[in-house]
Amino acid sequence: SDVYKRQDFLWGGATAANQVEGAYLEDGKGLSTSDVQPHGVFGEVVERVPGDSGIKDVAIDFYHRYKEDIALMAEMGFSVFRTSIAWSSLFPRGDEQQPNPQGIAFYRSLFEECKKHGIEPLVTLCHFDVPMHLVMEYGSWRNRKMVDFFSHYARTCFEAFDGLVKYWLTFNEQNLYHSPEAF
């Protein structure tokens, strides 16, 4: 169909870090709210420890297999790939001043791989997950300090991935953020 040949048509797909990456504690990543929610269940977020059966630890292992997955997306002719950055990969606790260099390196490599295959990354900064420490210590989004933590995280992303990411989204499904159980 001619619609797919249009220059302004974004042919692609979407995932989120918390849905596909797995590797929930590798390379310095901290726990996030998504890591500790039971599979397929929304509700109160409670602190858990590694080894708990409720932690989502593998997913589709995108963290280790993203190059294969991006190559498959290119085979399908994708021109765009919407994904997210796990805030707790860059800032394991969420309130650090300096980002985790291994988290930066992973996402830089991911976005470079997309570009190598002619795929434009479209990146969501917060896809229902925040570092668990921010929930336990500050009460998450009920605390105005979260604005500063998020701003620092966002600026870090913009600087670290400048030239690799052209399109940014702040929040996924922001209409759900009114719920105290969301995170």
Whereabouts are the PLM-identified features?
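Short, small-residue-biased leader/transition segments that mark boundaries at the very start
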Residues: 1-4
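Short, solvent-exposed beta-strand-terminating loops
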Residues: 11-40, 172-180
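Substrate-binding cleft and catalytic face of glycoside hydrolase catalytic domains
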Residues: 70-183
